[in-house]
Amino acid sequence: MRLTALPAFDDNYIWALVANDGRAVIVDPGQAAPVLEAAQREGFTPVAALLTHHHADHIGGVAELQQHFPALELYGPDDERMPSATRHVAHGDTVTALGIDFAVLEVPGHTRSHVAYVGDGHLFSGDTLFSLGCGRMFEGTPPQMFDALQRLASLPGETLVCCGHEYTLANAAFALHVDPTNAALQRRQQEAQAMRHAARPTLPISLKSELATNPFLRLHTPEIRAAAAAHASISITSDVDVFAELRRWKDAFRA
């Protein structure tokens, strides 16, 4: 089994999990061309697609892929904005493909029906969890997004996080602004800079690393709580309120 990150648009990743027999699971194919080119180059055939949410940069390539692979199974949340999902999934469901059981987790916040998939030691988090950051809340509330991130944070530390975008360096700038003395975060930024300089993805990354470096997963720590309270100029007592302030801060942040 091999995992490949297929770049799409300016900063998206389409994930391809390819079995030894050439069958593949594709995650969030926002464009068809990167998948078709990789399938021809590497000799794999997509048999299933896991869709995390309805945004076009995550599902825009589905129709063309169906033309090339008519037997393609399409899994996604039950959302009228995702007519491409032919097999609806919900929290607690299991999707079996390539002999792998992918657990479905509801993670609303970025969108109201967003889901994530966990299987074969990988977390496909869509736009909920990024390396060193998290997604914007276009439809959800801070408590929903907080709960979603806590759900993902509870997975085993060796889980490899496969995000929907290459946002690591931009997120690192904010994370270091909030948590400037975090040595693990400083190392992660340096490693990510070297990876991008070599035109390599900064993903996947272990959840253990994210728990040590991602401010949105470190809301309980004195450093993050103090930074959020100082920015808000008020006393903040709950982790949800710390998250809400941190997300507002990130939305307005310019490096």
From Swiss-Prot:
BP GO annotations: methylglyoxal catabolic process to D-lactate via S-lactoyl-glutathione
Pathway membership, UniProt: Secondary metabolite metabolism; methylglyoxal degradation; (R)-lactate from methylglyoxal: step 2/2
Binding site for Zn(2+) 1: H53, H55, H110, D127
Catalytically driven reaction(s): an S-(2-hydroxyacyl)glutathione + H2O = a 2-hydroxy carboxylate + glutathione + H(+)
Coiled-coil region: none
Keyword Transferase in record: no
NCBIfam families named in the record: GSH_gloB
Protein name: Hydroxyacylglutathione hydrolase
Organism for this UniProt entry: Xanthomonas campestris pv. campestris (strain ATCC 33913 / DSM 3586 / NCPPB 528 / LMG 568 / P 25)
Lineage, top ranks: Bacteria, Pseudomonadati, Pseudomonadota, Gammaproteobacteria, Lysobacterales
